[in-house]
Amino acid sequence: MTQLWVERTGTRRYIGRSTRGAQVLVGSEDVDGVFTPGELLKIALAACSGMASDQPLARRLGDDYQAVVKVSGAADRDQERYPLIEETMELDLSGLTEDEKERLLVVINRAVELACTVGRTLKSGTTVNLEVVDVGA
């Protein structure tokens, strides 16, 4: 299984890493060139929805179909959580009939509901444990 971690690079700035060599810059909203943790959460959801629906869409629209999944959601700063996250999947469906479009919407929603682990986790909630380890001893 891929290992994930973040390393502190400055005040409220981190770099996220994986054992597969991926990196992402994380920081405060006032820092250019970084994602906030909340933005990464929303991007993970959008990417998961796109990936979960990729094969059904490719079968119906062709392997080279274009898709953009936009995602948004304001934080409730009193509760420090996102009470609502909204996604919009933009596709060119002009080559489909109205019936085909309706069927495709059902297929997309079913694929995302069944295969998007991020969305399923957000909708059901999860347990998070934090352990603090003294590495200086």
From Swiss-Prot:
SUPFAM superfamilies: OsmC-like. It comes from the Bacteria. InterPro entries: KH_dom-like_a/b, OsmC/Ohr_fam, OsmC/Ohrsf. GO terms for cellular component: plasma membrane. This is Uncharacterized protein Rv2923c.
